[in-house]
């Protein structure tokens, strides 16, 4: 089914929902959400967190701090750590682990330089990687996996394997919502949204892990650089890590976080890994479970 056929099948309210994404003040709403999430209003904050957790069915039994009163702000709640051993890391040395809790949005083979966003929608490696053709070349005919983090999910992101950070790229962009419905109806979504591209060397070849921003994702951070945004510079910014500034991370180690959920995209080189056969589109997943095996 092509895009025009899909549009013809949409209800009136679905069309309004899509149109609103194009006209709403994305940055203003995101800044407002960021301001709100920082506020410490005592009992009011605790009450609103409780309402949020009830609406989205957040499982607080897995959190290191299971009581709503333990969180002074929404930010603290959004990036709440898990209890010890809540997410065991698969220790098979030939296995790569899922970086986050959520659902598989898409996964599979990169067809030359095209990745599947949703049925009927493709986007290019070159666009996703902000025009870095040399970097994109590494992943032609490789494998990819896209994990969507909903508001209910654990919001920290971890490493699929041992790795050495080579480069980080901040790419300014739009702030469309990245929920599955919008992924089906906003072309080139992940390549047009704000994102942080992290490039690693691993025993499985080069690997990219991308944190994709979205509406009301107030900030993205990494453990080596802290909060990346805000501020939100209007140009692409690149950091390189080598020599004394090299950053080494271990399998399962936290590497970053979203202040409210979004999407993580992993890229792997050709003939280096085989994605786990049990993973399907819309599969619920947990950080630490198997994502792929070494070929």
Swiss-Prot record:
GO terms for molecular function: phosphatidylserine decarboxylase activity. It catalyses: a 1,2-diacyl-sn-glycero-3-phospho-L-serine + H(+) = a 1,2-diacyl-sn-glycero-3-phosphoethanolamine + CO2. The keyword Lipid biosynthesis applies. Coiled coil: none annotated. Signal peptide: none annotated. Pathway: Phospholipid metabolism; phosphatidylethanolamine biosynthesis; phosphatidylethanolamine from CDP-diacylglycerol: step 2/2. Its EC number is 4.1.1.65. GO terms for cellular component: plasma membrane. GO terms for biological process: phosphatidylethanolamine biosynthetic process. Pfam families: PS_Dcarbxylase (PF02666). It is a peripheral membrane protein. Binds 1 pyruvoyl group covalently per subunit. The modification Pyruvic acid (Ser) is found at residue 262. InterPro entries: PS_Dcarbxylase, PSD-B, PSD_type1_pro. Is synthesized initially as an inactive proenzyme. Formation of the active enzyme involves a self-maturation process in which the active site pyruvoyl group is generated from an internal serine residue via an autocatalytic post-translational modification. Two non-identical subunits are generated from the proenzyme in this reaction, and the pyruvate is formed at the N-terminus of the alpha chain, which is derived from the carboxyl end of the proenzyme. Its main location: membrane. Its cofactor is pyruvate. It comes from the Bacteria. HAMAP family: PS_decarb_PSD_B_type1. This is Phosphatidylserine decarboxylase proenzyme. It comes from Pasteurella multocida (strain Pm70).
